[in-house]
Regions:
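N-terminal Rossmann-like FAD-binding beta1-loop-alpha1 element of flavoenzymes
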Residues: 2-28
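Conserved Rossmann-like nucleotide-cofactor binding loop
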Residues: 11, 34, 263
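Glycine-rich FAD pyrophosphate-binding loop
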Residues: 20-44
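N-terminal glycine-rich dinucleotide-binding loop that anchors FAD/FMN and/or NAD(P) in oxidoreductases
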Residues: 41-65
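Mobile amphipathic helical/loop "lid" adjacent to a hydrophobic cofactor/ligand pocket
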Residues: 61-179, 183
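Conserved flavin/dinucleotide-binding core of flavoenzymes
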Residues: 96, 318-416
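Helical element adjacent to the flavin cofactor pocket in flavoenzyme catalytic cores
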Residues: 184-245
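Mid-domain catalytic core of redox enzymes
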Residues: 227-360
Length: 416
C-alpha cells in the first residue's frame, strides 16, 4: 500500500511508524519546516526548554511511554502542582504543600477560605459519586455546579481556573465545558480518589528528542517538510494529493490519513461528504500566544503559592492566562526561572521565544462528533487522527494515529 499522511504531530508520526513497520510505503507531508506538531523545544544557553507538550505518566500514557522506551528516550520525575492567583481579590493558593494552601497567611483565620477548602473536598467526593451513577452526562460545568449547589467561590477559585489551565480555554468558555469530560479527566488522573498520586514525568533533554529519534527510524524520504497540502481529491481507485512546493504538484496514493486539526482536514477535502462536513465542522479551535521567558512577574505574588502550573487571572482579558514553571517541571536552572506563559497580559521582560498554538475546544458538539468521525474512518479511502479524538492530549493523538494505521492496513488486506 502506498499511503499519504498529512501532518507530522504525534498522530501522524505514530501512524507513519506503524505503517512502515508493516511494510507499507508512506509519504508524510508537513507544511511547517519542522516535524512534531505541538512538540516544541527551544534551546537557550545550552538548556532545552519545552513550550508545547511537557508531561506524561505511565498509567495514563501507556502507548506513549512504550514508544519512548522503544526509541531509547529517558524521562525524569516531575511535580504537577497547581496554583491560583486572583489579584482582583488579593487571593492566592497553591496545591504543592499545606503551606501553599495558605500562601496568604491571613487565610489561616479566614472562615471564607476554610469554607472554600471544604467545598473543594466536597466537590471531589460528590463528583466521584456522580460519575459512578452517570448523573453528569448531559450537564455543562456551570449547570453541574448549580445543580449540586456548590458555592460561587468553588467555581471562581478552583473549577474554572483548573479547566482553563488543563485545556487552554478562555475562562468565559469554561462554564459551558461538558461536566462529564472534566470530571472523567480528573478521575482518570487520580484527582477524585484517595489513592497514590500519578507519577508525572518529562523527557530528559526536551521532547524534541523523541521526535528526532522517531523520524530517524523512518525510511529515507518518508518525511517531506515545508510541503503544504492544498487539496485532496478522492475517487474509487485512489487519492490525489495536491501540494505546494515551488509550484503546485500532484501525487497519487492508495489511501490518506489526515493527522491534522479537524478544521484543517475539512478545508483540504475536495468534496467532503455530508457526514465528513458535519463531524469535522463540529470542532472549534482557539489560538493561544505562548511565550518562553524568565520574568517572575508572571508568577503568583507570594512565593509560597508558586507551582508548576500557575493560573493568574486577569479581569481585563477574556483569554486564559497560565504560566508553566519549566524550571520546576524539567529541572532547569531557576535563578531566574524558565517560564512559559499563555497569552501574557503584557510583554514579558527577558522574553526568549514566542509561538502560537491552536487547541480544540471540547464543547458537547465536539464530543458527539468524536464518535461520528471515528465511524467515518475508511470511507472514501480516508482516515482521521489527532488529539481531538480524546481529551486533547498526547496519548490521545498517538492512540488515534495507531488506530487509523491499523484500520488502513486491515482495509488494504481485505481488498486483496
Amino acid at each position: 500500500m502506498n499511503i499519504a499522511i498529512v501532518g507530522s504531530g504525534i498522530a501522524g508520526l505514530g501512524a507513519a511508524r506503524a505503517l512502515t513497520a508493516a511494510g507499507h510505503t508512506v509519504t508524510l507531508f508537513e507544511a511547517a519546516d519542522r516535524p512534531g506538531g505541538h512538540v516544541y523545544t527551544v534551546r537557550h544557553e545550552g538548556v532545552a526548554v519545552d513550550m508545547g507538550f511537557i508531561v506524561c505518566n505511565r498509567e495514563r500514557y501507556p502507548l506513549f511511554v512504550r514508544l519512548l522506551a522503544d526509541l531509547g528516550i529517558d524521562t525524569r520525575p516531575t511535580t504537577m502542582s497547581f496554583s491560583v492567583s486572583l489579584p482582583h481579590l488579593d487571593l492566592e493558593w497553591g496545591s504543592e504543600t499545606l503551606s501553599s494552601l495558605f500562601a496568604d497567611r491571613r487565610t489561616l483565620i479566614s472562615v471564607r477560605h476554610w469554607s472554600f477548602l471544604v467545598a473543594v473536598v466536597g466537590f471531589l467526593r460528590t463528583a466521584r459519586r456522580d460519575l459512578d451513577a452517570g448523573a453528569t452526562l448531559s450537564l455543562s460545568l456551570d449547570e453541574y455546579l448549580a445543580h449540586r449547589r456548590f458555592p460561587t467561590e468553588l467555581r471562581e477559585q478552583f473549577v474554572i481556573p483548573l479547566a482553563a489551565a488543563l485545556w487552554s480555554l478562555a475562562p468565559d468558555h469554561c462554564g459551558a465545558f461538558p461536566a462529564e469530560t472534566f470530571l472523567r479527566f480528573l478521575d482518570q488522573h487520580g484527582m477524585l480518589r484517595a489513592v497514590r498520586p500519578l507519577a508525572w514525568r518529562t523527557v530528559i533533554g526536551g521532547s524534541q528528542r523523541y521526535v528526532d529519534a522517531l523520524v530517524a527510524r523512518l525510511p529515507p524520504a518518508t518525511l517531506r517538510l515545508s510541503t503544504p497540502v492544498t487539496r485532496i481529491v478522492r475517487d474509487a481507485t485512489g487519492v490525489t494529493i495536491v501540494m505546494r512546493g515551488p509550484s503546485l504538484t500532484e501525487q497519487r496514493y492508495d489511501r490518506v490519513i489526515l493527522a491534522t486539526h479537524a478544521d484543517t482536514a475539512l478545508a483540504l477535502l475536495d468534496e467532503p461528504s455530508p457526514g465528513e462536513r458535519a463531524a469535522l465542522g463540529a470542532f472549534r479551535y482557539s489560538a493561544n500566544h505562548t511565550v518562553l521567558h524568565r520574568d517572575p512577574a508572571f508568577l503568583p505574588r507570594r512565593r509560597a503559592a508558586h507551582a508548576s502550573w500557575n493560573y493568574v487571572a486577569d479581569p481585563n482579558t477574556a483569554q486564559v492566562a497560565v504560566t508553566y514553571s519549566m524550571s520546576r517541571l524539567q529541572g532547569l536552572p531557576d535563578d531566574p526561572p524558565y517560564l512559559v506563559t499563555l497569552n501574557p497580559r503584557t510583554p514579558p521582560s527577558a522574553a526568549i521565544h514566542a509561538v502560537s498554538f491552536t487547541h480544540p475546544q471540547f464543547d458537547r458538539r465536539a464530543l458527539l462528533a468524536q464518535a461520528a468521525l471515528a465511524r467515518l474512518n475508511g470511507a472514501n479511502r480516508t482516515y482521521y487522527a489527532g488529539a481531538h479524538f480524546g481529551f486533547g492530549f498526547h496519548e490521545d493523538g498517538l492512540r488515534s494515529g495507531l488506530a487509523a494505521a491499523a484500520r488502513a492496513i486491515a482495509d488494504e488486506a481485505g481488498r486483496r
